[in-house]
């Protein structure tokens, strides 16, 4: 939310904003350089309230918790090395840090995402929906989902066969029984989300297997930015360079690097070059050009991977400043990056997710 608020007023904002929470406390800290006038405490309270943390008994009281804000400007050393204090042309802007980013795509779902991750993410979204619309009034904001899918490996491509296990652990109020929880989750969450063709008599459902989950949210567990980076990406498929996305403006290399390689991997699969692909990007701080770009199609490529890599390099501009322009990443004002903070950054049908737009890749079909 802080990223959106800054970009709405100043598209050149540089935001590296971290958040941590524990009982009755939210702390926001980091480095932000912006011309925007932002009330960070108001943002924190509104965000917590919108999530559903409206009283101490659900884990946090948005209106009465302590909010600590410690924001400084971006280091001038970083600023001069990366964007020259805003004097460099877009094609000259260097990476803001070292690191490697991965993009992944697979033809097992229409979203070109892993089915196990798509289902787990949709279950989480459905939990929020039935809590907020009152279908399951006993639900509270905290919860986790996990889906285990049985696959067939078709010469490197992953073909889903069935759902082996569905796991949902969700916070609840004191009044509901475990049997009621299980029945409601099956009827109102699992059935609307998981296609019947993937469920059978052997599918296992672990629904609140610990037996009790009343204490949750920041009261139950401390929270910190960047602790759930696999949920943000591909659910354990592909690979991850370790850098979190949330709280960072889109010029940060972890974020825009991951976005451009997702577009590249998705375009490889959507163009029929392969059924499954991973693209890796390697960066050095202050350097515009990537140190390396790597493509692996897991043996599913219609042409050799080295030829696919050549097509990718000819099609995509991996320089940081050009990524921001080509993906229109600096546009703010509509809660665009807030939407990425829950239910994943990839595989979403939303015009704001510009990195999900497929770029046609031209190649000679045999």
Curated annotation (Swiss-Prot):
GO terms for biological process: one-carbon metabolic process; S-adenosylmethionine biosynthetic process. ATP binds at residues 142-144, 210-213, 221, 227-228, 244, 248, 252. Keywords: ATP-binding, Cobalt, Cytoplasm, Magnesium, Metal-binding, Nucleotide-binding, One-carbon metabolism, Potassium, Transferase. K(+) binds at residue 18. Binds 2 divalent ions per subunit. The metal ions interact primarily with the substrate. Can utilize magnesium, manganese or cobalt (in vitro). Binds 1 potassium ion per subunit. The potassium ion interacts primarily with the substrate. InterPro entries: ADOMET_SYNTHASE_CS, S-AdoMet_synt_C, S-AdoMet_synt_central, S-AdoMet_synt_N, S-AdoMet_synthetase, S-AdoMet_synthetase_sfam. Pathway: Amino-acid biosynthesis; S-adenosyl-L-methionine biosynthesis; S-adenosyl-L-methionine from L-methionine: step 1/1. It holds the Pfam family S-AdoMet_synt_M. It is found in: Cytoplasm. Signal peptide: none annotated. Its main location: cytoplasm. Its EC number is 2.5.1.6. GO terms for cellular component: cytoplasm. Its cofactor is Mn(2+); Mg(2+); Co(2+); K(+). One of its GO terms (molecular function) is ATP binding. Homotetramer. Catalyzes the formation of S-adenosylmethionine from methionine and ATP. The reaction comprises two steps that are both catalyzed by the same enzyme: formation of S-adenosylmethionine (AdoMet) and triphosphate, and subsequent hydrolysis of the triphosphate. Belongs to the AdoMet synthase family. This is S-adenosylmethionine synthase 1.
């Amino acid at each position: 939310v802080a990223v959106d608020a800054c970009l709405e007023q100043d598209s050149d904002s540089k935001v590296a904003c971290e958040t941590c929470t524990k009982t009755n406390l939210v702390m926001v800290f980091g480095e932000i350089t912006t011309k925007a006038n932002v009330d960070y405490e108001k943002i924190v309270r509104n965000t917590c309230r919108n999530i559903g943390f409206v009283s101490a008994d659900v884990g946090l009281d948005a209106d009465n918790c302590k909010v600590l804000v410690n924001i400084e400007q971006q280091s001038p050393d970083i600023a001069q090395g990366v964007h020259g204090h805003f004097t460099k042309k877009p094609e000259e802007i260097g990476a803001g840090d070292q690191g490697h980013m991965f993009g992944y795509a697979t033809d097992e779902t229409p979203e070109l995402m892993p089915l196990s991750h798509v289902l787990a993410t949709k279950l989480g979204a459905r939990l929020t929906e039935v809590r907020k619309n009152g279908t399951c009034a006993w639900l509270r904001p905290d919860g986790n989902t996990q889906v285990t899918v049985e696959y067939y490996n078709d010469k490197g491509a992953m073909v889903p066969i069935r759902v082996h296990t569905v796991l949902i652990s969700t916070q609840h109020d004191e009044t509901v029984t475990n049997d009621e929880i299980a029945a409601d989750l099956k009827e109102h969450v699992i059935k609307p989300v998981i296609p019947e063709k993937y469920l059978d008599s052997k599918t296992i459902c672990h629904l609140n297997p610990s037996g009790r989950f009343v204490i949750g949210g920041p009261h139950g567990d401390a929270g910190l930015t960047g602790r759930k980076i696999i949920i943000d990406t591909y659910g354990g498929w592909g690979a991850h360079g370790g850098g979190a996305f949330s709280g960072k403006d889109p010029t940060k290399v972890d974020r825009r690097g991951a976005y451009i390689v997702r577009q590249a991997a998705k375009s490889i699969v959507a163009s029929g070059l392969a059924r499954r692909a991973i693209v890796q990007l390697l960066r050095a701080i202050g350097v515009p050009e990537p140190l390396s770009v790597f493509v692996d199609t897991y043996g599913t490529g219609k042409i050799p991977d080295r030829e696919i890599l050549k097509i990718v390099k000819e099609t995509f501009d991996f320089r940081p400043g050009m990524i921001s322009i080509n993906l229109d990443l600096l546009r703010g004002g509509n809660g665009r990056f807030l939407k990425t903070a829950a239910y994943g950054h990839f595989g979403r049908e939303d015009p704001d997710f510009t990195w999900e737009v497929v770029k046609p890749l031209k190649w000679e079909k045999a």
